[in-house]
């Protein structure tokens, strides 16, 4: 969410500067691996005049946070959505689930012309996260089925237990 890269974040003061901006929202008495408290780390945060990669709470990029926590029948213990990357029209959606049981299952079926899927359905990829796949592969990207893409579908609700980068 924003125009900057991680290197800009680093040069703007990095995690210590971000924690300084969070202030009372974090436990500043917690100890780090070095034995310092977060309060001590924050006190030593570099102040970089003119940087705009790390913004204050009073000057956010968006009025709502980039991330949100979801709860419901698909995620009874909670899930995370990067709502800043989601199409606003899809943030509230009801649809039929089209479930892929693994990355291999998805790869074999997602572009099959016989796949029973519509633009209003929800694509679900299971068993690709830390428990279902070895390690934590970046396997969370679910492509739009080709038969829908050919009709102009550019986005639809896609859910995965896998790690995703960027969006």
Residue ranges and their predicted role:
Residues 1-167:
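Catalytic or ion-coupling anion/metal-binding cores of large enzyme and transporter domains
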């Amino acid at each position: 969410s924003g125009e900057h890269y991680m290197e800009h974040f680093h040069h703007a003061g990095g995690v210590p500067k971000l924690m300084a901006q969070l202030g009372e929202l974090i436990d500043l008495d917690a100890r780090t691996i070095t034995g310092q408290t977060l309060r001590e780390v924050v006190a030593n945060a570099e102040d970089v005049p003119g940087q705009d990669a790390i913004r204050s709470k009073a000057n956010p990029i968006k009025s709502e946070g980039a991330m949100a926590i979801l709860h419901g029948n698909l995620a009874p213990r909670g899930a995370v959505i990067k709502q800043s990357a989601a199409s606003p029209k899809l943030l509230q959606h009801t649809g039929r689930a089209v479930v892929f049981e693994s990355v291999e299952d998805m790869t074999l079926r997602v572009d099959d012309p016989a796949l029973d899927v519509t633009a209003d359905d929800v694509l679900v990829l299971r068993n690709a996260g830390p428990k279902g796949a070895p390690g934590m592969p970046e396997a969370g990207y679910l492509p739009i089925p080709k038969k829908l893409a050919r009709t102009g579908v550019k986005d639809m609700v896609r859910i995965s237990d896998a790690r995703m980068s960027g969006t």
